[in-house]
Amino acid sequence: MDKILVRGGNTLKGTIPISGAKNACLPELAATLLTEDTVTLRNVPHLRDVTTMLELLGQHGAAITIDEKLGVSIDCKSIQNTMAPYDLVRTMRASVLVMGPLVARCGHAEISLPGGCAIGSRPINLHLRGLEMMGAHVTLEDGYVRIKAGRLKGAHIVFDLVTVTGTENLLMAATLADGITILDNAAAEPEVVDLANLLMAMGAKIDGAGTRTITIEGVKNLHGTSHDILPDRIETGTFMVAAAVTGGDITMTGTYPALLEAHIAKMREAGCQIDEMDRAIRVRAEAGTLRAVDITTLPHPGFPTDLQAQMMVLLTVAKGAAQIKETIFENRFMHVSELQRMGADITVQGNTAIVRGVPQLRGAPVMATDLRASASLVLAGLCAEGETLISRVYHIDRGYERIEEKLKALGADIQRLGR
């Protein structure tokens, strides 16, 4: 199993291109199941989770062509089966996103209960209740969710909690339903908007994406199209923190400041200089000048939970004490014990972490527990004194494209070690 070795202390400087967003790519790959025509997605990130989703589509019967320019063309004319098996779903929770498209187009689906990051229960009951309201019959047998339906019917669905994948699943299902579907308390994340843009390019009738109320008028068929996946705001935010904690100067290209308004505001409050351009963000920071800032994770447009662990690293070396309140997922402080091994002063009380800045972290052997936690440990290694050896880095490959190569290009002393 691969490990990553980081020797800290280098100041990172330079320009880095941002990859396509994993959290937009995965639902958009699933959306190709909705049509018999070919859909081409561009700016597809080369990630383990994307490979898993392509394998899942392939076993459903999709014909997949990949070009040399990060483009993927998917032809789902012939869906051979509607089962998402345990061996694929267990590795990636986003596999559940094929559920809505399969039920909408084929009238049935069998989905293994999902896996992915171990950051709380993240139940799919909100997805299932919505499908039931649209006329589907749902049963749970032998670890599989079995769903059967005729043509789905439009419904008024109010989410008890804001759910990104739940919004995406029901948004996709509703595009082929009979009648009008209203999703209230829907997720407003940029990735949901990007999915809606793809679906509308395929012929769907959608209004309100990016707000808390989305209205979908079902159509009988969707058609093929081409679509550019939006840039990854979480990768962007991660490299922004890398600039801050190393006292560096990094420009991220191919990304949009509007995707990260809450994160940019907090980094400015913490003492970073940030230049916003049309398709780029530049972050500069002086060593020893970072200030403590309180953070509460919230649904978009609030501070994203997927950048909580990275900002915690910044706060470990900032002046003063700060509070991080995690309101989205339970068990999302599993990186704290590893940061403490590196000398961080962090106390966890329920869903709140109190972070008191220290002059410097120290390198240590640490273990990644989930995707974003693994990124935080790399960031900690970059600003720590000495060597940090990070185990179980397969987590990071699920969401970051060639992270060690990109960091090395900016001046980091980092390398991947084989078994």
Curated annotation (Swiss-Prot):
Active-site annotation: C117
Pathway: Cell wall biogenesis; peptidoglycan biosynthesis
Binding site residues for phosphoenolpyruvate: K22, N23
Cellular location(s): Cytoplasm
Binding site for UDP-N-acetyl-alpha-D-glucosamine: R93, D306, I328
Major subcellular site: cytoplasm
Cited function: Cell wall formation. Adds enolpyruvyl to UDP-N-acetylglucosamine.
Protein name: UDP-N-acetylglucosamine 1-carboxyvinyltransferase
